Amino acid sequence: SAYGSEKGIHDLHNQGFPLVMVNRFQPEDVGKIETISVDNYHAGYDATRYLIRTGHKRIAFAYGREELIFYRERYRGYCDALKDAGLPYDEHLVMRETSGAECFYHLTRALMELPQPPDAIFASSDPKAFVIMHALHDLGKRIPADVSVLGFDNVAMASMVEPPLSTMAQPFREIGATAAKSVIRQIRYKEEHGVLPPANSYVMAYDLIIRRSTN
């Protein structure tokens, strides 16, 4: 869970409980506790590069809770992609979560009132993208003619909203299967050796799903 207790997880691990951390972990956890994630940095980079390649110059970013490493890594990829393309970083184009995904409704409306509003918005999760699209619709903005919107996750609703959401897909089924196999491996190893095995770190593939919310 993205909202679990890291201290509780580390306490369980120190007591010898088999577990795996999915997406939410710190760099120092790698090699100590089993971890699974997509390459969030390169996914954020590639998402931003896609928007740049399709002609966008003013790309906003919807940032999630900054204490969560996967949001930080997606943001870092966004920043580096802008830099490598020679586009200026503009703090005014970064919307920061204050009270859950619903806060992005008002943040998006404020964003579009800028003298130079964005021509694309990269949301660090699909739920944020849905709220952003709602705000843009209410403002009379056309997606993607006026503003392209790109999400992250590829949750089921992404293909059902109007227009269907372009997004960076995480392989949720494979992540779940890998997590289950990891726990089983740890249980069997501990039964045989009395301790947990050396920790593995699994980095899963991501995929850009292009739908009609981007040009």
Language-model features, listed with the residues they occupy:
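Bacterial carbohydrate/catabolite-sensing allosteric modules
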Residues: E6-N215
